[in-house]
């Protein structure tokens, strides 16, 4: 009975996407460490927020968001008392609604910010000018949101330093928990699924946002024409226009583009690949984050080529299964594949040590320690 009474309870509150890998990994990790999770959730966002939405759909999503808050507030007050309430990304508006009510109940707010909307919209995707009204508004909203949260969680130390400097925060307010991967969705590759043909498969998947560096991958594929490599590119998004134009203008026999694959099927494509690609963008954000795909590649035990950065160095260094290259450098990407081609032609598993540090249980223990410190 005493053990049941001492079990920590956390309220997960807001309009987050429950299928987002970050959310699933943190929730699973906490539960595996004995934490009870109570969910107060209204579905607003989903896969379309990461690809393309029509203007009507964007307006509809915003309207749904505002209409959801009365129910979420009611849920907050009727939910059992928790040691902390967690707000996941995209949780900017959630914080503004939750903050006054959290003060009434005396509950600690932990914001898993994950990304800066200001950085993403203004500097990474360049959807509005620096110094413009939209930029100042987004900065102001995030500045205030950072002060509403009692603790902010980010995915890398480099990202945490950016938040501290940009939004003028004390460093001790920000904690770091890596993204991790779902081993049930991205299990280790087995020899029977591995590509054993004469074709050497270089795999990239993503939503073609600037930090992915799709232009670098296409330039590398062009430079590698005539070599026995197939570049399999899965996905679509903001920068797929270059890929469409490339395939329309030239007969690229070494590129296979698959616009969409179900999330659950990505692992099968990774099984067949000789090497998987991370990111190659040269934006500031690309240097501060380690994207989901890198953790998923590590979880599969597959060889990885990605851009070098302060963020990735927090987790990885070069070895037989990892090559780090300068950002936006197509020639370096081609040379990296050439250098490792003979090794990666054969079946090997890599990243044994680091895999243990990206499991949900490991990350959940870090999150639990953070919550216990806040509680004490």
Where are these regions (language model features)?
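Carbohydrate-associated surface elements
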Residues: 158, 180
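A charged, aromatic-enriched C-terminal amphipathic alpha-helix characteristic of glycosyltransferases
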Residues: 268, 328, 341-375
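Membrane-proximal helix-turn-helix segments that form the acceptor-binding/catalytic region
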Residues: 73-74, 100-104, 132-152
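An aromatic- and histidine-rich active-site surface loop
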Residues: 20, 85-106, 110-121, 325
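Conserved donor-binding/catalytic core segment of Leloir-type glycosyltransferases
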Residues: 194-222, 232
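Conserved acidic donor-binding segment of nucleotide-sugar-dependent glycosyltransferases
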Residues: 318-329, 337-344
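Nucleotide-activated donor-binding/catalytic signature segment of Leloir-type glycosyltransferases, i.e.
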Residues: 199, 241-268
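Nucleotide-sugar-dependent
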Residues: 212, 262-269, 276-298, 305-314
